């Protein structure tokens, strides 16, 4: 089955499940004022240690993050959550996670460059503006992945 076919098959069940969670939590997925954030975890019938990839904070976007900051009265929390969501999405969904310890993690590279620029050592030293900048840079890195993969496919076809 292709990806589009699978999405069409499960979409009604996903939408129904989200509606149930919204009713239980009293929040709405995608709502700017009272956002519902969900976590998505891969699963298998048989336990596979090390294979439980998770994406947290699904539901955050440029508008919802502002509402989350207002709702929690914690702008730092909201922007750091958004940063983490984009990073996990890149790692888990787009395969940007390094395959070995020698490989460079593109998100860590971006964060380390900003730490160097700001002359700080710890993630906790990032300002709210730094976190906003990281979100922008992470989104830029994530949007480049499909272009990179397309170029790789073209190169492989030419080489064949």
Residue positions per predicted region:
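N-terminal beta-alpha lobe that positions the nucleotide/phosphoryl donor
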Residues: 1-160
């Amino acid at each position: 089955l292709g990806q589009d076919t699978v999405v069409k098959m499960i979409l009604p069940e996903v939408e129904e499940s989200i509606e149930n969670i919204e009713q239980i939590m009293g929040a709405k997925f995608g709502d700017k004022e009272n956002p519902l954030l969900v976590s998505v975890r891969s699963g298998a019938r048989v336990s596979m240690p090390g294979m439980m990839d998770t994406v947290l904070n699904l539901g955050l976007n440029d508008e919802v993050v502002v509402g989350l900051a207002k709702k929690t009265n914690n702008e730092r929390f909201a922007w750091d959550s958004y940063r983490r969501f984009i990073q996990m999405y890149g790692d888990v969904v787009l395969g940007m996670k390094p395959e070995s310890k020698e490989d460079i993690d593109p998100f860590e590279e971006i964060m380390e460059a900003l730490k160097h620029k700001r002359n700080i050592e710890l993630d906790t030293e990032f300002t709210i503006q730094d976190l906003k900048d990281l979100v922008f840079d992470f989104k830029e890195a994530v949007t480049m992945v499909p272009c990179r993969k397309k170029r790789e496919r073209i190169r492989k076809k030419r080489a064949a």
